[in-house]
């Protein structure tokens, strides 16, 4: 490839890093060019190459390491073939791990030389893997961690539809808002196969080389089959690759000289020499890859991709399993013969990373980047091991113990089951308590990791739910298995065996004190079995261990918050499955903030009282001069105001005792009194949750002040954000019911979530002991009992009897489950776990598809896509078959026959199975669900917060610089594909939209869509919001038809995850209607306003202000659609509502009144001049009416307040209409008006941060 191509591609890839590095690497004053280059600015260097194109230019930063430059070279299209090389400057080799600033004399326009290195066996294997990926010869990988289509994005196929719609009518022209959901919406589209460059590249049957040839530098033997049908045997040698004389029957790895000797340092170059068609095919492959957005194919590095719950069935063309001999060889190619290359000492890596310096910004960036990558690698490795443990593939260290008590070590990770195998939690609820405890432990460790306390260490921890089992994977803490001397405790701080023995150690006090202060934990006394007092900084359950490496480890962090005392003391609370019901950290934080604001208020009041008292006592006369007096007054005023602003909060302290009500017995009166005070504080916190937090959330949702949850996941996130535990679903459902029809949507969602979670607990109990080959049968049968009882009231589990004989000890009790018993058990579980009573016929009103989706996500199921039948009328019609001849349908024409019986001629002899909703074959796969303890980047968050504050203070330039720096930090630390980065893209796109930089907003919103799809799921609530925002920004940029395609896709997703009539869909329908008006599609626009009105009336009632606002818009839409009579009627309705709700003096009432008068006059004149109107209608073609009625609105995120979504400025200025009435009336009457808005000069969109990973920047 030409040099220019290489340069161009690279310059495309790096503008983001250019902008960013300048910001990250010091906000230096603008000094001389040279000094800036040396201080971390960007500069260009050239790289001299041994082959074509012989030289390339690369943009670098002095803060980059040499290995980053290497990576840039490896990824450029002109230099793909190099993997084994080093760089030289001035004839000296440069170390890969030094920063460029440390390379002597290196400056702008310097030339470094790429020198090819001899291969080692590992380098040769890596080179082979890379070239296979590069030329598209690698087949599909079967992965036990990532399921089918993991990391799928539909953005490109939706965008392709948008591009097509630009040429024809808009995408909502025939859209049916009330139609049932189509599952095709969330499936990958069929794509044309990629150009094939070679038939295969694999290891040869002669591999590995024998000893005597290894001595001569032979590393591997490969076999390459070209598109021309020839097969070549290739030797991988230390010097490169060459074609050898081997055949399938004869071994001779010496170079082949006939017709000529073919060798090259890179396998890519060698293939291009032996296959004439390779170069053309390879260029075509690159071209077709470049048509996709780079982000959609970018490999995951710091996150586990999302595995969709619905995938194409095995029979479809999308996931065809193809022959690939190298698939089974890949683990050898990647990790060597003995797999030792991938073994890592996880614990040592975690702790040494924690000990890295964090003084400078560069130190922190390097440390957090390493931390993020390490956690991602560990989470993936631990999850893979957990899957093997669950499947019984790993031998236990203690095989004689009971199954639940067995422990395992695999890949240097220690595994145990999240069950009470040794009776630790016997008094707390056994297995149920243990299961909850390990989940809470991960949350506790995550919180401590986030605090990043110097000198306090946590083990790497992951919890994996798979096939009904919960497995904990931890890095091995040095000394945890060490047998201590007699009299020594296994634990150095906290409760040793339960709470009977308590250990204390002076070394732990200072670090535990820092942790407890940050987590609002109170230092308190506990007593051992001998009633001896010990003062602990944390809960007695939280343990400190002094590792043999000298580090202080904190373990068992499941009790960093107090028990929810009120929950445990409710009537019938002893039936609750466990006693591990603790408060959430978010609630403790909210309670602390609430108490603090009370303290500040009281302090201000106290000061005012003191001041007022002092002023009363002042003598009336004053001896000072007037001048002095006035000076003092002004001084006093400023002091007074600053006094009110600044309240010293060091006097405020609030910390909760986590061991309250958990069996501690204080001894002295003083201790009892202290304990009673601690208990009161905890009770107040519990009361705060019940009397303030929960009612406030319900009220906010009732008033439409926050974004409405769409499914179980977004509901859970919303509750957790507010500090509400999932166990309060029942209480919330009661509160929601009391609010009446307005919150029906919330009540339905809460009840659906309780049913889904109850089913999950039941299914997990059965799956835990079912042999792996029968899991699909078990789940399918349970789902049929829950969702398919209408199709088949008595479903039978489908089990292969011959296979069953191999598992005499397997638990097959799931066969006995019937729809009736399952319903009874779900009712019992809901009553037990959520203290809510389901109505007697609850199963009759299930939303089948939505419930199926929620259950699939909770159990990690991947279902094959088809039109599932949950009711009898959804079943496909039966075609009577008699002896293979279709007698019944003879009069229905040939086409029908073809579709019906002729497809399967063997039907006559096959015994027909009873219809069921779900068969075992529908469950294509089960993926593990991973809970990790990865901390977020504090540095990136600090930069974002600083940028936000600067923008709020109107320091636009500084604010944008800080925000771009935060973006750079997010991408450097997390990599591009990460939920945190998706969130940031979303927030930044909003900020750019609000500052009127539309191009940048669209670019970032597009990235937000792709990264959200790939990390959170193609049909997650966040994905819907990302698409809706993208549609808004596209419309603002003038691409309204494209915007409507995105709205259509979002509406289709909404139907799948929630169903019709979601409260937030009112805003979306309004936005669609406004966009259609912009396209002058007045009839369609009117339909969407009417749909929006019907949802609004059903939710808020006919007399609400929301309804009046939509009536106001609908009246305008009717006027634009030439229905003046209808317009008058709707405007009158709007006016009457505003009048009764807001009074005659309100601005909205007055505006509606004015409109009503004008529309009424207009209607009269229209009736008089019917003929004129006919003529004027013909002139509509020349019209240029104003764009919007109410204008499009930003969609609030789930749990986000409306002003937050639209930006405070916009929220304040929102009024019914910004247009002059005359303009619209002129248009209705047929006058030729031109938009005043079009006359305004549009603000030039500010510079677009072209970020890495955009389509434009694809390499």
Curated annotation (Swiss-Prot):
Q: Which CDD domains match?
A: CLU-central
Pfam families attached here?
CLU, CLU_N, eIF3_p135, TPR_10, TPR_12
Q: Name one GO cellular component term.
A: cytoplasm
Write the record's keywords in alphabetical order, separated by commas.
Answer: Cytoplasm, Repeat, TPR repeat
- Could you tell me which InterPro entries the record lists for this protein? CLU-central (IPR033646), CLU_dom (IPR025697), CLU_N (IPR028275), CLU_prot (IPR027523), GSKIP_dom_sf (IPR023231), TPR-like_helical_dom_sf (IPR011990), TPR_rpt (IPR019734)
Give the source's domain of life in one word: Eukaryota
- Region annotation Disordered: residue ranges? 1-38, 612-647, 881-908, 1192-1215, 1229-1259
| Repeat positions for TPR | 982-1015, 1024-1057, 1066-1099
Clu domain location is: 324-568
Protein family: Belongs to the CLU family.
Q: How does it assemble?
A: May associate with the eukaryotic translation initiation factor 3 (eIF-3) complex.
Please identify the protein, giving its name as recorded: Clustered mitochondria protein homolog
Show the taxonomic lineage.
Answer: Eukaryota, Fungi, Dikarya, Ascomycota, Pezizomycotina
């Amino acid at each position: 490839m030409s040099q220019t191509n290489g340069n161009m591609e690279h310059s495309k890839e790096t503008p983001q890093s250019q902008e960013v590095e300048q910001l990250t690497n010091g906000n230096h004053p603008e000094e001389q060019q040279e000094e800036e280059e040396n201080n971390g600015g960007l500069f260009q260097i050239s790289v001299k190459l041994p082959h074509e194109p012989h030289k390339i230019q690369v943009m670098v930063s002095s803060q980059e390491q040499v290995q980053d430059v290497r990576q840039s070279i490896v990824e450029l299209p002109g230099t793909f073939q190099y993997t084994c090389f080093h760089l030289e400057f001035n004839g000296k080799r440069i170390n890969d791990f030094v920063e460029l600033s440390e390379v002597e004399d290196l400056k702008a326009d310097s030339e470094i030389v790429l020198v090819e290195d001899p291969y080692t066996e590992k380098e040769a294997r890596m080179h082979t893997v890379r070239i296979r990926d590069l030329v598209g010869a690698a087949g599909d990988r079967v992965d036990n961690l990532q399921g089918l289509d993991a990391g799928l994005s539909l953005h490109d196929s939706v965008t392709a539809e948008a591009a097509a719609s630009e040429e024809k009518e808009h995408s909502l022209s025939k859209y049916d808002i009330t139609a049932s959901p189509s599952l095709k919406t969330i499936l990958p589209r069929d794509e044309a196969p990629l150009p094939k460059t070679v038939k295969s590249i694999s290891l040869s049957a002669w591999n590995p080389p024998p000893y005597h040839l290894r001595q001569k530098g032979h590393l591997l033997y490969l076999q390459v089959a070209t598109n021309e049908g020839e097969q070549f045997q290739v030797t991988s040698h230390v010097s490169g690759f060459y074609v050898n004389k081997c055949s399938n029957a004869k071994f001779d790895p010496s170079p082949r000289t006939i017709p000529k000797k073919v060798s090259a340092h890179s396998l890519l170059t060698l293939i291009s020499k032996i296959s004439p068609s390779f170069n053309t095919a390879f260029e075509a492959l690159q071209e077709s890859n470049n048509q996709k957005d780079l982000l959609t194919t970018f490999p995951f590095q710091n996150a586990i991709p999302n595995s969709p719950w619905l995938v194409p069935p095995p029979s479809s063309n999308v996931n065809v399993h193809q022959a690939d001999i190298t698939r089974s060889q890949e683990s050898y190619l990647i990790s060597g013969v003995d797999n030792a290359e991938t073994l890592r000492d996880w614990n040592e890596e975690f702790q040494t990373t924690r000990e890295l310096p964090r003084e400078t910004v560069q130190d922190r960036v390097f440390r957090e980047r390493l931390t993020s990558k390490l956690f991602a690698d560990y989470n993936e490795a631990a999850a893979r091991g957990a899957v093997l443990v669950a499947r019984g593939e790993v031998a236990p260290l203690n095989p004689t113990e009971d199954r639940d008590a067995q422990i395992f070590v695999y890949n240097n990770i220690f595994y145990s089951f999240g069950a009470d195998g040794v009776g630790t939690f016997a008094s707390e609820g056994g297995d149920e308590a243990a299961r909850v405890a390990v989940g809470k432990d991960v949350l506790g460790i995550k919180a401590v990791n986030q605090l990043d306390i110097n000198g306090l260490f946590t083990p790497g921890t992951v919890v994996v739910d798979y096939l009904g089992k919960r497995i904990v994977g931890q890095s091995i803490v040095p000394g945890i298995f060490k047998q201590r001397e007699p009299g020594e405790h296994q634990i150095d701080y906290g409760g040793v065996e339960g709470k009977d023995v308590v250990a204390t150690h002076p070394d732990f006090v200072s670090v535990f004190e820092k942790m407890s202060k940050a987590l609002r934990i109170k230092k308190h006394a506990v007593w051992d079995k001998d009633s001896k007092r010990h003062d602990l900084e944390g809960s007695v359950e939280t343990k400190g261990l002094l590792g043999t490496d000298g580090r202080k480890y904190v373990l068992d962090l499941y009790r960093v918050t107090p028990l929810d005392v009120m929950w445990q003391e409710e009537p019938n609370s002893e039936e609750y499955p466990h006693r591990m019901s603790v408060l959430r950290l978010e609630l403790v934080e909210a309670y602390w903030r609430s108490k603090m604001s009370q303290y500040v208020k009281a302090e201000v009041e106290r000061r005012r009282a003191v001041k007022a008292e002092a002023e009363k006592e002042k003598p009336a006369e004053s001896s000072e001069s007037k001048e002095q007096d006035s000076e003092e007054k002004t001084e006093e005023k400023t002091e007074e105001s600053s006094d009110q602003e600044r309240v010293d909060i060091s006097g405020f302290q609030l910390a909760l005792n986590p061991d309250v009500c958990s069996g501690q017995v204080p001894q002295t009166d003083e201790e009892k009194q202290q304990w009673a005070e601690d208990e009161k504080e905890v009770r107040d916190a519990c009361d705060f949750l019940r009397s303030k937090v929960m009612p406030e959330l319900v009220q906010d949702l009732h008033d439409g002040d926050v974004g409405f949850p769409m499914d179980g996941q977004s509901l859970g996130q919303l509750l957790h954000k507010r500090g509400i535990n999932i166990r309060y679903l029942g209480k919330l459902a009661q509160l929601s019911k009391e609010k009446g029809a307005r919150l029906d949507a919330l009540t339905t969602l809460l009840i659906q979530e309780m049913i889904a979670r109850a089913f999950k607990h039941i299914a997990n109990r059965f799956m835990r002991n079912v042999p792996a080959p029968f899991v699909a049968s078990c789940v399918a049968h349970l789902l049929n009992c829950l969702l398919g009882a209408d199709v088949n009231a008595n479903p039978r589990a489908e089990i292969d009897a011959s296979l069953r004989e191999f598992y005499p000890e397997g638990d097959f009790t799931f066969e006995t489950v019937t729809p009736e018993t399952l319903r009874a058990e779900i009712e019992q579980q809901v009553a037990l776990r959520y203290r809510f009573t389901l109505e007697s016929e609850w199963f009759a009103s299930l939303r089948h598809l939505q419930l199926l989706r929620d259950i699939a996500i909770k159990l990690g199921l991947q279902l094959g896509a088809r039109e599932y039948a949950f009711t009898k009328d959804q079943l496909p019609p039966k075609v009577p078959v008699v002896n293979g001849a279709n007698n019944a349908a003879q009069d229905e024409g040939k086409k029908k026959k073809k579709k019906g019986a002729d497809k399967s001629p063997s039907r006559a002899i096959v015994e027909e199975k009873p219809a069921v909703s779900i068969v075992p074959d529908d469950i294509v796969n089960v993926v593990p669900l991973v809970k990790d303890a990865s901390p977020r980047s504090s540095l990136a968050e600090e930069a974002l917060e600083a940028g936000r504050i600067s923008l709020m203070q109107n320091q636009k330039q500084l604010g944008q610089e800080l925000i771009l720096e935060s973006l750079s930090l997010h991408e450097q630390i997390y990599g591009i594909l990460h939920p945190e980065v998706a969130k940031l893209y979303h927030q930044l796109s909003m900020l750019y939209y609000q500052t009127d930089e539309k191009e940048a907003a669209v670019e970032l919103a597009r990235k937000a869509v792709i990264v959200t799809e790939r990390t959170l799921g193609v049909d997650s609530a966040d994905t819907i919001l990302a698409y809706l925002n993208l549609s808004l920004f596209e419309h603002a940029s003038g691409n309204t038809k494209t915007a409507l395609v995105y709205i259509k896709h979002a509406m289709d997703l909404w139907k799948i995850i929630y169903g019709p009539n979601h409260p937030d869909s009112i805003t979306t329908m309004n936005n669609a209607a406004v966009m259609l008006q912009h396209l002058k599609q007045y009839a369609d626009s009117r339909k969407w306003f009417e749909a929006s009105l019907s949802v609004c009336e059903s939710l808020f009632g006919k007399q609400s202000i929301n309804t009046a606002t939509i009536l106001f818009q609908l009246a305008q839409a009717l006027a634009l659609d030439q229905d003046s009579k209808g317009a008058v009627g709707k405007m009158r309705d709007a006016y009457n509502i505003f009048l009764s709700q807001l009074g005659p003096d309100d601005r909205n009432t007055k505006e509606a009144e004015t409109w009503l008068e004008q529309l009424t006059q207009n209607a009269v004149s229209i009736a008089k001049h019917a003929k004129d109107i006919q003529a004027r209608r013909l002139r509509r073609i020349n019209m240029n009416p104003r764009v919007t009625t109410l204008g499009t609105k930003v969609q609030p995120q789930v749990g986000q307040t409306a002003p937050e979504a639209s930006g405070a400025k916009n929220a304040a200025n929102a009024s019914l209409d910004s247009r002059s009435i005359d303009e619209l009336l002129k248009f209705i009457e047929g006058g030729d008006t031109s938009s005043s808005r079009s006359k305004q000069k549009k603000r030039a969109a500010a510079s677009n941060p072209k970020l890495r990973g955009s389509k434009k920047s694809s390499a």
